[in-house]
């Protein structure tokens, strides 16, 4: 039996497009809720974990508030390309675990799908604490739910429900070496988030 590579990659492409469309749908629904609850106009905003990509699959908040006059992007990548989306954007190259910014610098600190990539549980706790430290009032952190049926990073269903050590071994076996390492992917559940927030003595929060 021979593999028709053209048909194979066409199917892979169709599957990728399906996942992207589903992810966009759910992400848009989440931001609908966020914009109903939080006023962004006239606020000083920091986006932690921006990526150097103009596709609206990335940097969701920046795409949705293009007219905002005070938005800063902090990333360990060079994100100067994002000025094409909004010339008012200020770019800072830095580390979300230690931003070196002053306390209470921003009205809103936002981070989308970054916390699952900062590494260990300790690092994830530190990431939350740092976002809280530099925000005057509001912190928004989005991350995929570990117990959603499909992991959107690997496109593999269900195996991420398993204990993390077993999950990582299976990722190696499926040639997902990058995501098999904790420093590159450490998925969180709703209970994980609650636990981290309680560790930071945060009582006023919503998870949705």
Question: What name fits each language-model region?
Answer:
Residues 15-17, 173-183:
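Short glycine/proline- and acidic residue-enriched helix-loop micro-motifs
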Residues 22-30, 123, 185-192:
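Soluble or luminal CAZymes and related metallo-dependent hydrolases
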Residues 37-38, 43-148:
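Conserved SAM-binding loop
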Residues 1-39:
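Class I SAM-dependent methyltransferase Rossmann-like catalytic core
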Residues 178-201:
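Short alpha-helix
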Residues 202-208:
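Conserved S-adenosyl-L-methionine
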Residues 138-167:
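Conserved class I S-adenosyl-L-methionine
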């Amino acid at each position: 039996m021979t593999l028709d590579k053209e048909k194979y990659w066409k199917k892979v492409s169709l599957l990728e497009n399906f996942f992207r469309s589903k992810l966009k749908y759910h992400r848009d629904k989440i931001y609908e809720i966020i914009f109903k609850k939080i006023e962004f106009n006239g606020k000083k905003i920091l986006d932690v974990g921006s990526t150097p990509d103009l596709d609206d699959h990335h940097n969701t908040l920046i795409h949705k508030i293009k007219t905002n006059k005070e938005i800063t992007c902090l990333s360990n990548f060079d994100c100067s390309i994002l000025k094409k989306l909004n010339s008012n954007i200020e770019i800072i190259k830095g580390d979300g675990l230690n931003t070196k910014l002053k306390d209470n610098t921003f009205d809103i600190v936002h981070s989308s799908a970054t916390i699952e990539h900062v590494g260990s549980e300790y690092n994830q706790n530190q990431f939350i604490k740092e976002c809280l430290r530099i925000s005057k009032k509001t912190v928004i952190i989005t991350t995929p739910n570990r117990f959603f049926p499909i992991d959107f990073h690997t496109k593999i269903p269900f195996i991420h429900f398993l204990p993390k050590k077993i999950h990582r071994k299976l990722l190696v076996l499926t040639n997902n070496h990058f995501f098999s390492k904790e420093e590159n992917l450490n998925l969180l559940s709703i209970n994980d988030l609650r636990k981290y927030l309680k560790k930071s003595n945060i009582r006023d929060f919503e998870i949705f």
